[in-house]
Every structure is written in structure tokens, then in C-alpha cells.
């Protein structure tokens, strides 16, 4: 059985929880207090961060790596595209999410006021650029829920918490976010600590 060491407020852990619930398989989640991490976390992950996935003698960290492994191991429902070109494009989007969106979270959480404000603007502007996509399609890659939707959902859930206000032209993105938040796997994957992050 797979075991996920998951931070109860960690957006990257939330990604992995969403995938595990989407797959509907047997797994165990061990909640990790990010302010009082167990000693064995640093043994499993040299960066001493969550999430960490353990299956027999395999130990994985980094949410996108964990999620691709789970998707390959349990291919239904498939969350990464099957075709090599589409799969490569999906990976490129995941890379861009990390660099253009999630890279700003540390500055918002623990930077100076100036750094946090700059990071909020960067996230707001990037999300506003994405918004028109959802006028014509239901999810990131079209009509099917995919790993890209999994990757961005935790950030969208935390917009209020991070103090990020989107302009009116981002309305299609917010409708998309509500579609994500209404998925049964998303709801099941929420921790009690995450439920209070959104008004």
C-alpha cells in the first residue's frame, strides 16, 4: 500500500492527495505538522519537505514526480495525456506553473512586505493571462480533467489566504476554480486546516 506523508496545509501535498482520491485506490495518509516535522522526514527527503510517497522500497518526493508515478502505476482515470507530444506539452505547463506561479509562494509566506506584494502581483497577472482559456473549455487541456488542473487547484484554493485579488476579466478562471472545488476527489482531499483557508 502507498503511504503519503502530507503536510496538512502544504499545497504540494494537497496535489498528491487529490490524485490519490481521483484514482480511488487504497492508500494511507500520514499527516505531518509542518512546524514540528518528524525526524524520519529528513531521512526520506533530503530537503525535509512534504509530500513524500513511500511504496515498499520506493521513496519519492516532489509533488509532480509523485503524481506522475501514481498516474503511471494506476492508469485509470488517466491524468497525463497518452500521446507523447501532448504529454511533453503538459510537462512544460507544469514547469511553467512552478516557475511563474508557485515560485512566488515563499515570498508571499515569508518575504518582506515589498517582496510579498511583488509576488502577489506576479501571481495575479499570470492567472489573469490564463483566464481566457476557460471561456471555451472546461479544463486546462480541454474537456477532460488532467494533471494540470491538479497542479493549479491548491493555489486557486488559497487566493484569499495569500491576499491575491483577481480582476473582473479573470471571471472565467474563477468559474473554472469552482468546477475544480466541486469535484468529489478535491473535497475528500481537503484537510481540516485547508478548509479554513478559503472564505
Where are these regions (language model features)?
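GST-like domain detector, emphasizing the conserved glutathione-binding G-site
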Residues: 1-131
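Short, solvent-exposed turn/loop segments enriched in Gly/Ser/Thr/Pro and often Arg
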Residues: 7, 147, 193
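Residue-level detector of family-conserved "landmark" positions at structurally sensitive sites
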Residues: 30, 63, 169, 190-191
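Conserved residues at the C-terminal ends of beta-strands
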Residues: 56, 153, 192
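GST-like fold's C-terminal all-alpha helical module
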Residues: 85, 97-189
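Carbohydrate-binding/catalytic loop surfaces
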Residues: 194-199
